[in-house]
């Protein structure tokens, strides 16, 4: 999918949480209705078959419960995209990446080969299944891992065994770590731990720009990779470093620097880092350190201040505000305003922001923030994932257009606001601020209820552990704590209350922008009947 990702290390976030976030965007000319659901262990398949590639995979018999944001129409498969499991591990999959001819020549994609001829007749060739891809990743991995590192290792093993038919970037997080995995060709992969004090920006381009192979084949403190990656690089002359002392650069070896990158990918990384580090360097003009078309914009950077949930929403909604490239702006001209692909684009399906909070009990520390539709016109609101079901307003998305579910209501609002951007901007901003504040209040009040139920967990320990976790536990203990039935009822009630308030405010916004857009219709006239 044509997506945009931001990852925020725990020391770079405003509250010590790990935060992973990604826009899921459809291909140009397509729109994809989404649902927010809970997948229970009994509903998880034991034998999985991909709709697109036809690959069949036997799955373990002990899945964890997890959330997902699948397609409402399953004709092309599940596409679970983002979720949190009962071990408080989050996963976002996938960011479609670019590659180059050298990589694909050395390790081609594993694509579905249809059958030729008719079975039983001379010359018949049976179908050959393809590999795994974005359709499959969340379903195949998230229910079976208890740490972010385990997520990397499980997906890596699946890639080596079954291969893939596309380039993908995948994020995993737990309370302590964030890992970013990038596929390389059909069967290879690399993964790097996001520095705690940094954030990562990822447009649709292979991003990791420095990789320690010695660590990946040794202690694996911050790097992991496929078993034969070093041999693969050497055999195919993929290391483009000029000097032997230069760190290996995967972006040069496995990625791309094409003309299309400079209108579709690099400008997005430029704008996100320009917003989060405005004073670190010169971003504009001929003497800029990095420009929208620069190929060397860093994969990871330390922010100038701590990053909030609202910052994440802003950068993932952005359309180059304050620059000549803003399609809604007054700077520049018609050429510049449509020069680069915006981050907040018309064909956004959903945005999922997964936050794992070390300062709350295991049962309530995970939050999955959700937005549907085009980000400049929607709102991001929190839901607790460790529940038995999700609110119908977000779950019961239909393939039929209706104002009765969150996805379609957002789609309608965005279409109305686009042509009346200036006239509806204030109403949208007020809606975003009000619903965002409602979300933070809901989280705070629910935290208080959970604290009364389970007690102040900080009293159970003499001191916080080395990562600031107030309730450090082994994975089995986390799962047991998260399955507290009474706590789940509290979290589910909070989610339902959030959804009810959200619908009320979204209905009000729809009413407001519909009136404004109707008044701006070209067939209006300033006189009425006498």
Positions of predicted regions on the chain:
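Glycine-rich, aromatic-lined ligand/substrate-binding cores of catalytic
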Residues: 231-364
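Short, well-ordered beta-strand elements within core beta-sheets of diverse protein domains
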Residues: 138-144
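Substrate-recognition/cap regions that form aromatic- and gly/pro-loop-enriched pockets
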Residues: 325-463
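Histidine-centered catalytic/metal-binding microenvironments
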Residues: 436-530
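Short, charged, surface-exposed loops that flank catalytic or proteolytic processing sites
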Residues: 144-150
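Short, well-structured alpha-helical segments that form the helix of a local strand-helix-strand
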Residues: 151-160, 312-316
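A contiguous strand-loop segment
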Residues: 2-134, 154-289
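C-terminal/peripheral segments of proteins
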Residues: 15, 26-29, 36-45, 58, ...
């Amino acid at each position: 999918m044509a997506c945009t990702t931001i990852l925020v290390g725990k020391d770079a976030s405003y509250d010590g949480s790990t935060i992973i976030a990604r826009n899921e965007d459809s291909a140009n000319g397509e729109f994809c209705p989404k649902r927010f659901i809970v997948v229970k262990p009994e509903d998880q398949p034991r034998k999985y078959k991909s709709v697109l590639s036809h690959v069949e995979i036997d799955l373990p018999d002990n899945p964890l419960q997890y959330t997902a944001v699948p397609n409402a129409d399953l004709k092309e498969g599940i596409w679970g995209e983002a979720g949190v499991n009962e071990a408080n591990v989050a996963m976002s999959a996938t960011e479609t990446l670019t590659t180059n001819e050298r990589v694909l020549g050395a390790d081609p994609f594993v694509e579905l080969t249809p059958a030729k001829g008719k079975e039983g007749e001379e010359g018949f060739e049976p179908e050959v299944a393809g590999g795994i891809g974005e359709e499959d990743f969340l379903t195949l991995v998230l229910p079976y891992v208890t740490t972010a590192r385990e997520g990397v290792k499980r997906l890596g093993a699946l890639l080596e065994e079954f291969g893939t038919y596309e380039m993908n970037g995948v994020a995993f997080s737990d309370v302590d770590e964030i890992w970013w995995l990038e596929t390389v060709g059909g069967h290879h992969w690399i993964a790097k731990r996001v520095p705690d004090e940094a954030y990562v920006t990822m447009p649709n381009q292979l991003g990791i720009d420095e990789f320690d192979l010695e660590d990946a084949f040794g202690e694996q403190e911050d790097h992991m990779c496929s078993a034969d990656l070093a041999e693969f690089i050497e055999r195919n002359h993929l290391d483009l470093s000029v000097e032997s002392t230069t760190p290996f650069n995967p972006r040069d070896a496995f990625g791309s620097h094409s003309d299309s990158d400079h209108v579709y990918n690099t400008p997005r990384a430029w704008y996100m880092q320009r917003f989060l580090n405005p004073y670190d360097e010169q971003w504009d003009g001929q003497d800029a350190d990095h420009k929208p078309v620069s190929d060397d914009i860093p994969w990871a950077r330390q922010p100038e201040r701590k990053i909030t949930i609202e910052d994440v929403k802003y950068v993932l909604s952005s359309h180059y505000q304050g620059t000549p490239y803003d399609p809604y702006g007054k700077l520049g001209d018609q050429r510049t305003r449509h020069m680069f692909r915006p981050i907040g684009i018309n064909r956004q399906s959903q945005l999922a922001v997964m936050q794992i909070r070390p300062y709350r009990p295991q049962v309530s520390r995970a939050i999955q923030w959700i937005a549907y539709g085009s980000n400049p016109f929607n709102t991001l609101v929190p839901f607790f994932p460790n529940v038995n079901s999700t609110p119908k307003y977000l779950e019961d998305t239909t393939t039929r257009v209706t104002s009765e579910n969150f996805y379609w209501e957002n789609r309608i609002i965005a279409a109305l606001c686009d042509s009346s951007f200036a006239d509806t901007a204030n109403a949208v901003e007020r809606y975003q601020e009000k619903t965002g504040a409602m979300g933070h209040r809901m989280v705070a009040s629910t935290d208080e209820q959970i604290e009364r139920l389970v007690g102040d967990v900080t009293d159970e320990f003499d001191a916080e552990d080395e990562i600031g976790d107030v309730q450090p536990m082994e994975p089995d203990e986390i799962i047991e704590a998260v399955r507290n039935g009474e706590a789940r009822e509290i979290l589910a009630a909070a989610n339902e209350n959030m959804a009810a308030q959200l619908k009320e405010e979204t209905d009000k916004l729809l009413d407001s922008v519909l009136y404004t857009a109707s008044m701006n219709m070209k067939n209006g006239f300033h006189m009425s009947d006498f």
